[in-house]
Amino acid sequence: MSNSCDLTGHGWQNGNMVSHSNRKTKKRFMPNLQRVTVFSDVLKQKFRFKVSAKTIRTIDFKGGLDDFLRNTKNSKLSKSALVLKKRIMKKVSGDGTNDRKA
């Protein structure tokens, strides 16, 4: 699964390319994957991921990697993202000083 997002697990999709004359040919739609390094404020550590452009925009919108993982449902995250989310939640619950939305 090299063509999938490390955080959300979004991969390629199959579909049809439809011409002007309405001919249909099979097409594989690949996600726009980028290698990014993201910093976790809670863990004080950098993480390198291969993520889709949509996920990068969502991380920026949510306010960083920590808030993205905390506010995203577990069903929408990949297994590696769930492991990282668990580490972040454990660190936040054990240390009351990391409440960023005060």
Curated annotation (Swiss-Prot):
Disordered: annotated segments: 1-27
Start-end of Polar residues biased regions: 1-20
Keyword Ribonucleoprotein among UniProt keywords: yes
GO CC terms, sorted: cytosolic large ribosomal subunit
Database matches in Pfam families: Ribosomal_L28
The entry's keywords: Ribonucleoprotein, Ribosomal protein
Sequence intervals crossing the membrane: none
HAMAP family: Ribosomal_bL28 (MF_00373)
Protein name as catalogued: Large ribosomal subunit protein bL28
Originating species: Neorickettsia sennetsu (strain ATCC VR-367 / Miyayama)
Lineage: Bacteria, Pseudomonadati, Pseudomonadota, Alphaproteobacteria, Rickettsiales
Gene: rpmB
